[in-house]
């Protein structure tokens, strides 16, 4: 569930950024680079998990599972940077807390903007720019299911960002591997969701 404080912070911050033209303009090289980094990060996470499960190469490496979670998260982070870039938005040089800022930008521009959340209406969100785009691919699903996927994608980005900080050495190896699989699944689903949305805008 989106936290009220994040919704309010996102609305305040990005209305101000839009009014003051704070965003930098991304160039084609930036777009290509962020898209490649998103794909490569997820590929690296999958590669490391495969090595961890099927070879002895990393069995004594205590940081392998941590890096799988980190690279899974970065896949999502770069995917959102790419999505924002397609909309002419690149974080300005010197932006504070880039990871939190990118998360807030994602929920503002693709979930809050154009929905009831922007007008401060109570109750559940029923429309968003992303839900309308995703509906092109999911015609058989009703709007509430669409919104569950959209809100889930924002939650994935947030929880992965938190997991990157919270992952500790207390877990057993089996528990660590289980967590890495969850991270890869989240990153894969998130990437698919964003890529579908991007593709829908080209139709």
Feature map (PLM): residue ranges:
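Terminal alpha-helical segments
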Residues: 1-203
């Amino acid at each position: 569930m989106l936290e009220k404080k994040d919704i309010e912070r996102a609305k305040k911050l990005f209305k101000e950024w839009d009014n003051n033209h704070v965003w930098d303009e991304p160039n084609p090289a930036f777009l290509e680079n962020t898209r490649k980094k998103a794909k490569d990060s997820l590929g690296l996470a999958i590669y490391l998990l495969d090595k961890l499960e099927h070879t002895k190469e990393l069995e004594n490496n205590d940081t392998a599972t941590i890096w799988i979670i980190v690279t899974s998260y970065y896949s999502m982070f770069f995917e959102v940077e790419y999505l924002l870039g397609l909309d002419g938005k690149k974080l300005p040089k010197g932006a504070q807390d880039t990871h939190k800022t990118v998360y807030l930008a994602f929920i503002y521009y693709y979930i809050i903007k154009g929905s009831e959340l922007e007008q401060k209406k109570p109750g559940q969100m029923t429309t968003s720019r992303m839900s309308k785009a995703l509906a092109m691919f999911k015609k058989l699903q009703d709007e509430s299911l669409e919104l569950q996927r959209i809100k889930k994608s924002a939650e994935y980005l947030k929880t992965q960002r938190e997991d990157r900080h919270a992952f500790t050495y207390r877990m057993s190896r089996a528990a660590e591997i289980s967590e890495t699989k969850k991270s890869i699944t989240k990153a894969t689903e998130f990437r698919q969701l964003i890529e579908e949305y991007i593709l829908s805008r080209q139709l």
